[in-house]
UniProtKB/Swiss-Prot annotation:
Secreted found in the keyword field: yes
Name this protein carries in UniProt: Flagellin FljM
Keyword ATP-binding attached: no
A matching Pfam family: Flagellin_N
Function: Flagellin is the subunit protein which polymerizes to form the filaments of bacterial flagella.
Annotated source species: Caulobacter vibrioides (strain ATCC 19089 / CIP 103742 / CB 15) (Caulobacter crescentus)
PANTHER family xrefs: FLAGELLIN (PTHR42792:SF2)
Compartments in which it is found: Secreted; Bacterial flagellum
Quaternary data: In C.crescentus, the flagellar filament is composed of multiple flagellins of 29 kDa; 27 kDa and 25 kDa.
Keywords: Bacterial flagellum, Secreted
Gene: fljM
Family annotation (InterPro entries): Flagellin (IPR001492), Flagellin_C (IPR046358), Flagellin_N (IPR001029)
Family the entry assigns: Belongs to the bacterial flagellin family.
Gene Ontology CC: bacterial-type flagellum; extracellular region
Any one Gene Ontology molecular-function term assigned to this protein's record: structural molecule activity
């Protein structure tokens, strides 16, 4: 049987406990809605918070990986552009050498062709030396390979350099001809240089494709990590909004229950009137 006491109002105490519990839940839900997160700190859930922090750090480090790979892309793109120019120049050099091999040419015409040939040769040197991105080149013979970040653990994506200088193509700074016979011989030399250049460019193209593929993978991996972190810590706002309305109603009822419980002491007084 319930005990009526003016010293202890157990009904009010229970109502107050329930109201405090509701208020605590309400504060938590409001915080989740305000921040958009169900796990905002280690005290919310230490294990999940730690996992989310680690995954978030890994996802963040992927930005450095993407930056490095994009530099790699640009470095290769510059080398490929220079290579296109160089193969065009070699084609024109072959044309000049072929024309100069004509024994029916007069001296003036021969010398003009030789001058054009020499000028085209020198342009190859300029094209190769200017094939730099951010001061780095894989076409000018200054390096054998370049390594770019491949993952957050520091592993590398390595690109083998392809020298497109005159020396790298089997030519020299003095490669030329002084007779029609020498011009004819030069045709074969240029053909070899052209084949060498196209082979090197094909290899760079393969490296570029591989780098592009890996960059796409890194982007998808970063997106997956971000999504995973979101699944761990992000709040379901639709669910929290519905819960907020429910708790607000519960809070109002709790206030009324506490008010009713507090009135029980007054009802005891009426027994003595």
């Amino acid at each position: 049987m319930a005990l009526n006491s003016i010293n202890t109002n157990s009904g009010a105490l229970i109502a107050l406990q329930n109201l405090n519990s509701t208020n605590a839940e309400l504060t938590q839900v409001q915080q989740r809605i305000n921040t958009g997160k169900k796990i905002g700190s280690a005290k919310d859930n230490g294990a999940i918070w730690a996992t989310a922090k680690n995954q978030s750090a890994t996802a963040g480090s992927m930005n450095a990986v993407k930056d490095s790979l994009q530099r790699g892309q640009s470095t290769i793109d510059v080398a490929l552009a220079a290579g296109d120019t160089i193969t065009d120049l070699l084609g024109k050099m072959k044309e000049k050498a072929l024309a100069a091999s004509d024994t029916s040419l007069n001296t003036a015409s021969f010398n003009a062709l030789k001058s054009d040939f020499d000028s085209l040769r020198d342009q190859i040197t300029k094209a190769a030396s200017n094939a730099k991105f951010n001061g780095v080149s894989i076409a000018d013979g200054t390096t054998t390979k370049l390594s770019f970040l491949a993952n957050s653990d520091g592993s590398a994506f390595t690109v083998t350099a392809k020298t497109l200088t005159l020396g790298g193509l089997g030519l020299t700074a003095t490669s030329s001809f002084t007779t029609a016979a020498a011009a004819k011989t030069m045709i074969g030399t240029i053909d070899t240089a052209l084949q060498t250049a196209t082979n090197k460019l094909a290899s760079l193209g393969t490296s570029s494709t591989g780098l592009d593929t890996h960059l796409t993978f890194v982007g998808k991996l970063q997106d997956s990590l971000d999504a995973g972190v979101g699944n761990l810590v992000d709040a379901d706002l639709a669910k929290e909004s519905a819960k907020l309305q429910s708790l607000q109603t519960k809070q109002q009822l709790g206030v009324q229950a506490l008010s009713i419980a507090n009135q029980s002491s007054s009802s005891i007084l009426s027994l003595f009137r």
